[in-house]
Design a protein with these regions (language model features):
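C-terminal helix-loop subdomains that flank or include functional centers
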Residues: 225, 251-253, 257, 276-277, ...
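Short hydrophobic/aromatic patch on the recognition helix
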Residues: 232, 236, 284-285, 289
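Alpha-helical DNA-recognition elements
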Residues: 238-239, 291-292, 303
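Long amphipathic N-terminal alpha/beta scaffold segment
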Residues: 36-74
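Generic hydrophobic, amphipathic alpha-helix propensity
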Residues: 197-201, 248-253
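Glycine- and acidic-residue-biased ligand/ion/polar-headgroup-sensing regions
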Residues: 57-59, 66-95
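Alpha-helical bundle regulatory/interaction domains
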Residues: 1-42, 81-82, 91-212, 218-219, ...
Length: 321
């Protein structure tokens, strides 16, 4: 059984959070390219969940997280699709078949129209390559090969929270899809086998992510991790590729993004949200935001506004009966 503890994954590319039914299904249609997707909530009212998405030239990675139980049907693709459970144990039904647990990586070919059943707190990653990005071999993968593929996907997702910015995130995503395009070899198992982050760095990550009020202090952070300041700096740089402060900065920017994504007011208070996270100069904040996420803060807000302006079908058409 897979470990299913909460994972940051695509938090930096959040598109919807605490979304209503209409917003969630419309966004999923837009991001997946499947206009006939339908969904059926297990109970009425309230937020459906969150959606994140990262695009690259070689493919798209989508994260679905349910805050309430929901069945989603109508998924299809012109290319093979990879599904990976990240939190909880979702269920899947393929070609109208019986529901079964989705408890490991699954590769689906274009004719595999499928449905997902998400319980509250369930999170699923959908990895959709561009046309021609994957080789034909991937749909015929053996159990051994699937285990290696899962390790490759896990390694990619574990590295994403530690990229320096948007450009590196997209480069990493391109390399990930390129890796999947070549036939499996034993070397991939050795190079991409999953490994845990050093426990001292795990403490650092938890401190930064779980204590929004904390102001950066390398000495305090090193003491918390149980290492010297110098060792912490070089340990994190070696293990993740970024410095402790860079990770702290990205975490603060991600928290601002979460508030912008949730914003439904007529005039978004971008400067207020930025100031709450310690960014006092709006111009520099906007530049850093774009460097990390590939868009300006105003564009994050505008994406949701554009979504709301779309011609969304009535609730009767969206909900399966």
């Amino acid at each position: 059984m897979r470990k299913t503890s909460p994972k940051p994954d695509l938090d930096a590319y959040l598109r919807l959070n605490n979304a209503s039914f209409e917003e969630w299904i419309t966004a999923l249609r837009v991001l997946s390219g499947c206009d006939d997707i339908k969904c059926r909530p297990h109970s009425g009212g309230g937020s459906i969940g969150s959606l994140s998405a990262l695009d690259s030239a070689r493919g798209r990675v989508i994260s679905l997280k349910a805050s309430k139980g929901i069945d989603v049907s109508g998924f299809r693709s012109t290319e093979s699709v990879l599904l990976l459970p990240r939190e909880g144990v979702p269920e899947i039904a393929i070609r109208g078949g019986l529901w079964r647990p989705l408890d490991r990586l699954l590769v689906l070919v274009p004719q595999d129209r499928f449905e997902l059943r998400l319980a509250p707190g369930t999170k699923v990653m959908i990895l959709r390559p561009e046309i021609g990005a994957l080789g034909d071999w991937i749909a015929q993968s053996s159990d051994q090969c699937l285990s290696v593929l899962e390790a490759i996907v896990d390694c990619y997702l574990e590295r994403l929270p530690f990229v320096r910015g948007d450009e590196q995130a997209r480069q990493l995503t391109n390399r990930f899809f390129d890796t999947l395009a070549t036939p499996w070899t034993p070397r991939k198992a050795a190079v991409c086998s999953e490994r845990n982050l050093d426990r001292r760095l795990q403490r650092v990550v938890e401190k930064i992510m779980q204590d929004p009020a904390w102001e950066f202090d390398l000495k305090e952070l090193a003491s918390y991790a149980g290492v010297s300041e110098r060792n912490l700096y070089y340990l994190m740089k070696r293990e993740t590729g970024i410095t402790p402060y860079r990770f702290y900065q990205r975490a603060r920017l991600t928290r601002v993004r979460e508030r912008l994504v949730d914003c439904q007011c007529e005039v978004p208070h971008i400067s207020w949200y930025a100031a709450d996270e310690g960014f006092s100069h709006l111009g520099r904040f906007a530049a850093m935001y774009r460097e990390h996420f590939g868009e300006l803060p105003s564009e994050t807000v505008q994406w949701r506004r554009n979504l709301l302006r779309r011609s969304v079908a009535s609730a009767e058409e969206l909900v399966e009966t």
